[in-house]
Amino acid sequence: MKTLLVVFFCYLPLLTLAGEDAVPDTETMPLANSVPFATAQLASTSTSISSPNPAELKIISLAPHLTEWAFSLGLGPNLVGVSDYSDYPEAAKNIQRVADFQGADIAAIVALEPDLILAWDGGNKPQDIHKLSSMGLNVFSSKVENITDIASEIKRLGALTSTQKKATQLSNDFLTDLNTLKNKYDGRPLKPVFYYSWTAPLMTIGPNAWGNKLLSICGAQTLFPDSPVDYPQVSIKDVLVRQPHALIAASKNSYQELDVFWREHRNFLDAPLVIVDPDVTSRFSLRLINELKSLCEGIK
């Protein structure tokens, strides 16, 4: 259980390692010996940097979703270092690990001599990002607060790495599918659902949590919209009293394993149990669209 909690609290965007006010200093130095193919603005700074030929670019990713973005843009071969839990696509599993929930391995990163470091503003430690950028390394700091930010951030990364055409295509496809889903479920009263990841302790999501933003696409909302915190601990009684329209388990466990917990309460609760993949719903990934379709279908 301790291991599961560590993974959840350190790598799901539902909870961040850095506070909202902890904005890293992302000012960077120009890339050495680079060819000026493309430029992009880095977060929290007005500094523009030029990227070298993409074929020669050495990239390090400090978050699993950033690793996925790089592969989506055809930059998988350029990755020389990634964070723990960078497990998609399969090829990502074979790349050297240079960061985990404790932080970035600065020495290992420097030794790899990267041209570009992809950092997660809100997930990576601000002091690590500041340290790397202060050493003259180029840091692309990405911040995602809403689902549509995934598309805009991928376009920003594409502009920086001379993969604009691919990034624009991916971004447009993502937004088209997202808007189709939103339009399908828009305009109806929000259905209350109980979204959880485990049962010991039984925890759910508040109104401002990432999971609730996913639910809103499906015309639903957390069963606890009045929660003052993003990830409240609740009791079975709380759930039964509020009578959710559906139970959403973000879990790798089977339906049979998850249903055992609710079985003794079925005389008072007839909400269907829907399972979503936490590796997808918790990441700012392009794969999120297909998982959202399954989520919405289960709730309707």
Residue ranges and their predicted role:
Residues 57-112, 116-123, 128, 223:
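A short, structured surface patch at a secondary-structure boundary
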Residues 1-5:
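Positively charged n-region of N-terminal signal peptides that target proteins for export
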Residues 106-113, 135, 234-243:
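Short helices/loops that flank or line small-molecule/ion binding pockets
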Residues 83, 208-231, 274-275:
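His/Asp/Glu-enriched short active-site or ligand-binding loop at hydrolase and phosphoryl-transfer sites
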Residues 52, 57-70, 165-218:
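Basic- and aromatic-lined ligand-binding clefts that recognize polyanionic substrates
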Residues 126-156:
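Flexible loop/hinge segments that line or gate small-molecule binding clefts
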Residues 6-15:
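Bacterial N-terminal signal peptides
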